[in-house]
Amino acid sequence: MKGYHTSMPQSRTIGSIMPANYFDDSFKLISEAGMNHVRFVFYWDSYERDPTNFMLELQSVAEAADKYNVNVMYDNHQFHTSSWFNPQRGTGFPSFLFQDNPSYPAGNGGGPKYTPAKAWWTARWNRSVTDTNGTDGWTLHAEFFKKIVDTLDSHKSTLGYEILSEPQVHSADQWEKIGKYNTFMVNELRKL
């Protein structure tokens, strides 16, 4: 399941805004069909484009899910890394993690076969991706995710969170680094 403001890439506008009752009607239909849980996809890229409407939309999802007793797994997703790399299809990580770095030229493909994406993911797992202020990407991701958890954790429908769906792995040694990243994220979220 997706929303509008929680799926909007920084680099483009997609479709039209969903009807005001979209989440209420959807969760009612899901509940009446006998299903009791869904996965709701969201993108950090989308939060940076419009933080207010992003968070309002998440709140609407949680309220509708509570109303119809449907549990939600909130999925922090990425597709082709970011709209920075793939303006036509990509979304996921915000542009400030790529800007001002000649190793990550805009529009050069975010899928696993593209050299800039491979370089970025390798740097990410090495914890060397930073914003223009020098703050590392892991810390920035944790700060973003804490906002998600703060908004959703008190809802009875919140089943859990997927920290990062579909990460790219380009060498066997990156698995250990991904483990360190996941441990870092969980430890940060447990501070709430």
Residue positions per predicted region:
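Active-site mouth of glycoside hydrolases
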Residues: 1-192
